[in-house]
């Protein structure tokens, strides 16, 4: 279910403060965050945000197509190693 338009997008306050500081100082270092639930705002475009996937921080470079999505969508939490191969029986 989508969020109500009258409520607006959700962004953690500490993440927004870090992003505003990075934009003001023109810092190019990744902004480290654990907030996967925060929505990507237009202010984030051009920044690299290191999103935690449960094990490590995955660097995500924000582009204009990402606006409106959640940060957690771009840092996968599960790795798919493939289905087990069939064992061939030698005669």
Curated annotation (Swiss-Prot):
Keywords attached to this entry: Ribonucleoprotein, Ribosomal protein, RNA-binding, rRNA-binding
Tell me the Gene3D superfamilies matching this sequence. 30s Ribosomal Protein S19, Chain A
> Which InterPro entries would you find in this protein's record?
Ribosomal_uS19, Ribosomal_uS19_bac-type, Ribosomal_uS19_CS, Ribosomal_uS19_SF
State whether keyword Nucleotidyltransferase applies. Answer: no
Molecular-function annotations in GO: rRNA binding; structural constituent of ribosome
* A GO CC annotation given for this chain: small ribosomal subunit
Biological process (GO) annotations held by this record are: ribosomal small subunit assembly; translation
PANTHER family per the record? RIBOSOMAL PROTEIN S19P FAMILY MEMBER, SMALL RIBOSOMAL SUBUNIT PROTEIN US19M
The family assignment reads: Belongs to the universal ribosomal protein uS19 family.
What's its job? Protein S19 forms a complex with S13 that binds strongly to the 16S ribosomal RNA.
Put simply, this protein is called: Small ribosomal subunit protein uS19
Source organism of the structure: Verminephrobacter eiseniae (strain EF01-2)
Organism ancestry: Bacteria, Pseudomonadati, Pseudomonadota, Betaproteobacteria, Burkholderiales
């Amino acid at each position: 279910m989508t969020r109500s338009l009258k409520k607006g997008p959700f962004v953690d306050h500490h993440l927004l403060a870090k992003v505003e500081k990075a934009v003001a100082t023109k810092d190019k270092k990744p902004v480290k965050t654990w907030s996967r639930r925060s929505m990507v705002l237009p202010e984030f475009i051009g920044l690299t945000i290191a999103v935690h996937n449960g094990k490590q921080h995955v660097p995500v470079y924000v582009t204009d197509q990402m606006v409106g999505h959640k940060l957690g969508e771009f840092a996968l939490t599960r790795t798919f190693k493939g289905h087990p191969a069939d064992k061939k029986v030698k005669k």
